[in-house]
């Protein structure tokens, strides 16, 4: 299953409602699971981004659907990185001439 790294930042609305952040994170985790995925890690962070999560989802379409649904709520903005494991990269690199 593809892995995605999510860099998440609060919007003005999201930070105003910060007391609901754990509830919103749990709802996001449930949405990922309903779509057949799994939240691997999740961290609140200090620095350039407010929250970082790693999720597995069945495919890019599932990822886009989950993240659009998250975005329309207006509490966060996301940057999504599709991640590749060392073994996945090894397969690609082994085919290089």
Regions found by a protein language model. Name each.
Residues 1-97:
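A compositional/biophysical signature of low hydrophobicity enriched in polar/charged and small residues
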């Amino acid at each position: 299953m593809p892995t995605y790294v999510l860099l998440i930042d609060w919007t003005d609305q999201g930070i105003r409602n910060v007391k609901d952040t754990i509830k919103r994170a749990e709802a996001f985790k449930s949405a990922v699971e309903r779509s057949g995925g799994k939240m691997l890690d999740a961290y609140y962070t200090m620095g350039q981004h407010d929250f970082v999560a790693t999720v597995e989802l069945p495919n890019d379409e599932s990822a886009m659907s989950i993240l659009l649904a998250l975005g329309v709520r207006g509490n966060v903005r996301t940057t999504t990185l599709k991640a590749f494991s060392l073994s996945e990269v090894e397969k690609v690199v082994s085919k290089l001439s």
